[in-house]
């Protein structure tokens, strides 16, 4: 795509955010690996993001991410525009609706910050968010959860923005929600295809409509008790997860009535490595960057783990992390690796 077309569109839209070109995505993702993005946009605020989206050519690929804690960008990089919401859509406030206490959080707010804010307000139910290393937008997009609670368990409503810059407030009933799965239901009134889903896109993609914020409904609780729960959760996380090395959290979804980590460990794959990527000896569902890992190293480990577990146990693990972009050398790419191609959130 011709850069003059992009520049003209941005000038015409009158955007106020920051546009960066040819940015190494290892600087924006928690795996600290991968190729470069053709463009990265950091919006000034929600109206600015709307202006940016409206100004783009209709066929410009758009990816939205937060902290990049659930995302791998292949070594060949990614074409199009990557919108980084972390620390940008960062509104966080207490509201009340007919006696129900709500916390509004922008999509770029870190999940842990929401948990701390809720504790400060004497509200419970959001403690688990302290253990999710991503943003509100990413947690909404994948129904992130830990220790028995999932994001949509506490959602009252969400705010979204589409490629035309249109904002909507939607109730949970507009979505199909499951384990690490969120999809917008078909809008029967217009007879249109499921909003945000391109033909042949994965069924859990929200490609043309993204979360820009959410209202969480939380019960009253004692602030000290909430803080103690958060403290205990974080201690458990430190004890069980390899937080000392770059990683993207859980790589695979847990199969029904089982744990991905248990299956991987049962196959003797702890400390299995390719290049700088290794299955963590502390938690088998984590792949860590031991230093200098490429995206190809990480993706090769993912493929090898899936293949080995399938061969030895008969269980086919499903990926939880998102992989976007093109390989540095497509002819050498491990094509059997399953991946999501949508432009949804990356943590």
Curated annotation (Swiss-Prot):
The active site is at residues 180, 250, 320. Its EC number is 1.3.1.98. Residues 33-221 form the FAD-binding PCMH-type domain. It comes from the Bacteria. InterPro entries: FAD-bd_PCMH (IPR016166), FAD-bd_PCMH-like_sf (IPR036318), FAD-bd_PCMH_sub1 (IPR016167), FAD-bd_PCMH_sub2 (IPR016169), MurB (IPR003170), MurB_C (IPR011601), MurB_C_sf (IPR036635), Oxid_FAD_bind_N (IPR006094). Pathway: Cell wall biogenesis; peptidoglycan biosynthesis. Its main location: cytoplasm. One of its GO terms (biological process) is regulation of cell shape. Its cofactor is FAD. It is found in: Cytoplasm. It catalyses: UDP-N-acetyl-alpha-D-muramate + NADP(+) = UDP-N-acetyl-3-O-(1-carboxyvinyl)-alpha-D-glucosamine + NADPH + H(+). Belongs to the MurB family. This is UDP-N-acetylenolpyruvoylglucosamine reductase. It comes from Nitrosospira multiformis (strain ATCC 25196 / NCIMB 11849 / C 71).
